[in-house]
């Protein structure tokens, strides 16, 4: 790869960077298994093929790569004007996040931002739509300012208030408890909140 700005999935490097103290204790077969279950090679082919796509165009390319079809009910109820915080359950992780961002991004002409795990900032096509949250270490000093700027911006915000994708509990897939941050900040700023169900 000659393009230094192109991020490719490198499970080995991610583990070294995000867990430097524990990395030497991780068996190589575990690293190989992780590469296989995250489909490192397939995703890297996609990232290379979509390297020129940014924002909602990148989300559209993701939908194609995932061969995902979206059946949206009630899109006519989405307001055209005003600023909103869209909150949703997160049953599938990446796929539902991509789909929700794609639908809202198309509706609001690309003016959307997600609060996301900071690892996703490595995806150049997705990064313009992201406000990063560090889920594995200390938050950056400017994190509260970044969140405040997101709520103050003229972008629609997308949040998954459980903070993680849904978990299986007693045989049922459901979200973890939702954090109230989106309600508190939305009220402070004067944004309406819209609950979406995926």
What residues fall within each predicted segment?
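Membrane-anchoring hydrophobic helices of lipid-metabolizing enzymes
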Residues: 1-84, 97-99, 109, 127
């Amino acid at each position: 790869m000659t393009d230094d700005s192109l991020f490719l999935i490198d499970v080995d490097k991610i583990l070294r960077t995000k867990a430097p103290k524990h990395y030497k204790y991780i068996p190589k077969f575990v690293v190989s298994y992780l590469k296989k279950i995250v489909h490192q090679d397939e995703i890297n082919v996609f990232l290379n093929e979509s390297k020129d796509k940014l924002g909602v165009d990148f989300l559209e390319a993701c939908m194609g790569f995932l061969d995902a079809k979206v059946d949206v009910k009630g899109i006519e109820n989405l307001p055209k004007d005003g600023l909103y915080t869209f909150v949703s359950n997160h049953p599938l992780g990446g796929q539902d996040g991509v789909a929700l961002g794609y639908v809202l991004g198309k509706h609001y002409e690309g003016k959307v931002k997600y609060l996301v795990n900071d690892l996703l900032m490595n995806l150049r096509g997705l990064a313009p739509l992201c406000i990063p949250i560090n889920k594995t270490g200390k938050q950056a000093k400017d994190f509260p300012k970044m969140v405040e700027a997101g709520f103050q911006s003229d972008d629609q915000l997308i949040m998954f208030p459980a903070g993680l994708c849904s978990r299986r509990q007693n045989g049922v897939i459901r979200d973890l408890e939702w954090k109230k941050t989106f309600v508190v900040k939305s009220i402070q700023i004067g944004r309406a909140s819209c609950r979406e169900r995926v």
